[in-house]
From Swiss-Prot:
Locations listed in the record: Endoplasmic reticulum membrane; Golgi apparatus membrane
GO BP field: endoplasmic reticulum membrane organization; intracellular protein transport; positive regulation of ER to Golgi vesicle-mediated transport; positive regulation of organelle assembly; regulation of Golgi organization; vesicle-mediated transport
Protein known as: Syntaxin-18
Gene Ontology cellular-component annotations: endoplasmic reticulum membrane; Golgi membrane
Topology in membrane: Single-pass type IV membrane protein
Molecular-function annotations in GO: protein domain specific binding; SNAP receptor activity
Sorted UniProt keywords: Coiled coil, Endoplasmic reticulum, ER-Golgi transport, Golgi apparatus, Membrane, Protein transport, Transmembrane, Transmembrane helix, Transport
Source organism of the structure: Mus musculus (Mouse)
Length: 334
């Protein structure tokens, strides 16, 4: 005879709900809540490799954003003509260069350390391939940021060279001539002011006394005029200065080309260094694998030597027993 235990089941469910409420456990209000309770899983633990890789990518992204944010101020060689707001000095640019190089070197060392630790840890082949792909992506991201920095630095150096070239080509201001003219003007004004009262007080001054003054003025005018020898000397000096400026201009152009070439070679050198670092890591892994293979080969050789020694003992034992058997049979037959 079947027994109806529906009331007992409802009482049990009510007891479980009351206990869960007392313990502070969330209870689903229906099918969805029960499904959430059944299929709820603990969060997947994140490994140290993922967090460190994200940290390196975040640092590289910050460096890229910083370079792009200060790109205009960094490559502007004429910042002294701007206002104080947004102006960047050469010392700040040098500090940016130094910090960027240290930052790139630190990120490269961090990638190398992550690659070494990833190869040392024991994981499945799929995990190893995944980590290798992640490190290759981070390495490529760092190379692109290095290329951006190298281009900015090359542009800055080129503009600095252009600025120096233009500053050398500017004519020198004739300050001495202006000073001499400015000094002569007050003297002439003072002489005129003193000459007028004298002329008014002595209107009947003889003409002979005024002739020396005219003679001195005429002599001064003659001194201002240049002789043909002086004109020729100044022309030769101008030709010499023009030749020097042309030679300086050619030297500046050569230096500019060399600086651009050095920047390009530096970019290639950075890429080659990163490639060599990857090749060194692969060679290290091959050396480690070869060492393990050599150890396994030595163990196999030792085991083979032991097996050969035991085999020789059994052969000797068999030969000795055969010899004794033949001697026994010969004795027994006789």
């Amino acid at each position: 005879m079947a027994v109806d235990i529906t009331l007992l089941f409802r009482a049990s469910v009510k007891t479980v709900k009351t206990r869960n409420k007392a313990l502070g456990v969330a209870v689903g209000g229906g099918a969805d809540g029960s499904r959430d309770e059944l299929f709820r899983r603990s969060p997947r633990p994140k490994g140290d490799f993922s967090s460190r890789a994200r940290e390196v990518i975040s640092h590289i992204g910050k460096l890229r954003d910083f370079l792009l944010e200060h790109r205009k101020e960094y490559i502007n060689a004429y910042s002294h003509t701007m206002s104080d707001y947004g102006r960047m000095t050469d010392t700040e640019r040098d500090q940016i260069d130094q910090d960027a190089q240290i930052f790139i070197r630190t990120c490269s060392e961090a990638i190398h350390q992550l690659r070494t630790e990833a190869h040392k840890e024991i994981h499945s082949q799929q995990v190893k391939e995944h980590r290798t792909a992640v490190l290759d992506f981070v390495d490529d991201y760092l190379k692109r940021v290095c290329k951006l920095y190298s281009e900015q630095r090359a542009i800055r150096v080129k503009r600095v060279v252009d600025k120096k070239r233009l500053s050398k080509l500017e004519p020198e201001p004739h300050t001495k001539r202006k000073d001499s003219t400015s000094e002569k003007a007050p003297q002439n004004a003072s002489q005129d002011s003193e000459g007028k009262p004298a002329a008014e007080e002595l209107p009947e001054k003889p003409l002979a006394e005024s002739q020396p003054e005219l003679g001195t003025w005429g002599d001064g005018k003659g001194e201002d005029e240049l002789s043909p020898e002086e004109i020729q000397m100044f022309e030769q000096e101008n030709q010499r200065l023009i030749g020097e400026m042309n030679s300086l201009f050619d030297e500046v152009r050569q230096i500019e080309g060399k600086v651009v070439e050095i920047s390009r070679l530096q970019e290639i050198f950075t890429e080659k260094v990163l490639q060599q670092e990857t090749e060194i890591d692969s060679i290290h892994q091959l050396v480690v694998g070869a060492t393990e293979n050599i150890k396994e080969g030595n163990e196999d050789i030792r085991e083979a030597i032991k097996n050969n020694a035991g085999f020789r003992v059994w052969i000797l034992f068999f030969l000795v027993m055969c010899s004794f058997s033949l001697l026994f049979l010969d004795w027994y037959d006789s």
